[in-house]
Amino acid sequence: MGAARLLPNLTLCLQLLILCCQTQGENHPSPNFNQYVRDQGAMTDQLSRRQIREYQLYSRTSGKHVQVTGRRISATAEDGNKFAKLIVETDTFGSRVRIKGAESEKYICMNKRGKLIGKPSGKSKDCVFTEIVLENNYTAFQNARHEGWFMAFTRQGRPRQASRSRQNQREAHFIKRLYQGQLPFPNHAERQKQFEFVGSAPTRRTKRTRRPQSQT
């Protein structure tokens, strides 16, 4: 009799315990992985091995390639120019990179006035850019320190004021191209002679003698 009376009470206690555990589980927030990715993407990754790529950046506006000739950055280099070869290092496991000229060994950075300059060290945040792949298959580069400021060039290949640049503007659009070095016969004035044909002395044309017509 006593055990039969205790059985309903034990069942009720067990149900209350299960309900309490379910309530605590519902109140505990699930981890936000998207926020975790954003937070980690904003930090420099010191643990993972950095990925290094080499390519050229073709400017949509100038029709030339970005080159680093020291402190000066421009988009006036021809295809295969040694100063147009860029070494791109990943900064995080996301899409942030550091861009360095292979020949000059200077990093592309952006100062507080929004001007592109070359620096020997790329450790500061103003030398980090976020790659943004656009719908038109072009790529834009937003500075990590100055959000909303993009790498951009004018039609003449001069750097444009970053504070006036926007992601949807042609001046901020680039295409990644493989670096294959200079062409064997570049279109240069002093090397035009390599395309000339070997001349030969003109030959005389012999006159064709006509046979006298027979008179009938």
Curated annotation (Swiss-Prot):
GO terms for molecular function: growth factor activity; type 1 fibroblast growth factor receptor binding; type 2 fibroblast growth factor receptor binding. Residues 1-22 form the signal peptide. Gene3D superfamilies: 2.80.10.50. GO terms for biological process: fibroblast growth factor receptor signaling pathway; neurogenesis; positive regulation of cell population proliferation; positive regulation of MAPK cascade; regulation of cell migration. Pfam families: FGF. Transmembrane segments: none annotated. It comes from Rattus norvegicus. This is Fibroblast growth factor 17. Glycans are attached at residue 137. InterPro entries: Fibroblast_GF_fam, IL1/FGF. Residues 204-216 have a biased composition (Basic residues). One of its GO terms (cellular component) is extracellular space. It is found in: Secreted. SMART domains: FGF. Interacts with FGFR3 and FGFR4. Keywords: Developmental protein, Glycoprotein, Growth factor, Secreted, Signal. Belongs to the heparin-binding growth factors family. Expressed in embryonic brain, mostly in the isthmus cerebellar neuroepithelium and septum neuroepithelium, and in all adult tissues. The keyword Signal applies. Plays an important role in the regulation of embryonic development and as signaling molecule in the induction and patterning of the embryonic brain. Required for normal brain development. PANTHER family: FIBROBLAST GROWTH FACTOR (PTHR11486). CDD domains: beta-trefoil_FGF17. Residues 195-216 are annotated as: Disordered. Disulfide bonds: none annotated.
